[in-house]
Amino acid sequence: MLDREGFRPNVGIILLNAHNEVFWGKRLREHSWQFPQGGIKYGETPVQAMYRELHEETGLLPEHVKVIGRTRDWLRYEVPDKFIKREVRGHYRGQKQIWFLLRMVGRDCDICLRATDHPEFDAWRWNEYWVPLDCVIEFKRDVYQLALTELSRFLRRPQPRTERPGGHHHGQRYPRMASSVNAPPGASMASSMTVTTVTTAIAVESTLRATIESDCSSTEDPAVQAPGLRD
């Protein structure tokens, strides 16, 4: 479903915890990180689409979150032609998004990346609200910055921590990584590549993924052809 200008209606989600840290998900079998987002289906309102995408991508239900705010208008980004299927070039231009700021009132263990048969993420982490966006695919960065900036007016004073920063396994900082492995938002990158560094990064990522799946066990845009870019 495209508008007259060739943009597909979409919702984006910035999910906060009590410390004003933001949820980031790692794209399935990729080394890029992003916020939950997805298309608005015919007949859906943006709010309905937001709750559906929230559950599909994070496993969270409406009772696990509180809506704090949303962008006043659509924010748009264009998808480069090389990522658009040939048969729709000239018609499809990109996405227009309403962004929602949510605060999580549930527990970290309520997050489950395998709530559906087609998960979007294979790892997740909490990170500071303001971080460099180098890990985000380039054509989405401006929209991320606009959404974060507009919605920052709703931020409140964070709750004091009961544990040291990074004490929770989902929020721990990754070690320095070689340039072939993208770090999570805000994490540092190694200046040179070594076999030990790459091995360590992969081992940490595998451990994080296994831990997430263990915790959760108890509790597509047709115009875009590149993996990880459909939403």
Swiss-Prot record:
A motif (Nudix box) lies at residues 38-59. GO terms for molecular function: pyrophosphatase activity. Signal peptide: none annotated. Its cofactor is a divalent metal cation. InterPro entries: Nudix_hydrolase (IPR020476), NUDIX_hydrolase-like_dom_sf (IPR015797), NUDIX_hydrolase_CS (IPR020084), NUDIX_hydrolase_dom (IPR000086), RppH (IPR022927). CDD domains: NUDIX_Ap4A_hydrolase_plant_like. Its EC number is 3.6.1.-. It holds the Pfam family NUDIX. Residues 6-149 form the Nudix hydrolase domain. Keywords: Hydrolase. Belongs to the Nudix hydrolase family. RppH subfamily. HAMAP family: Nudix_RppH (MF_00298). Accelerates the degradation of transcripts by removing pyrophosphate from the 5'-end of triphosphorylated RNA, leading to a more labile monophosphorylated state that can stimulate subsequent ribonuclease cleavage. This is RNA pyrophosphohydrolase. The gene is rppH.
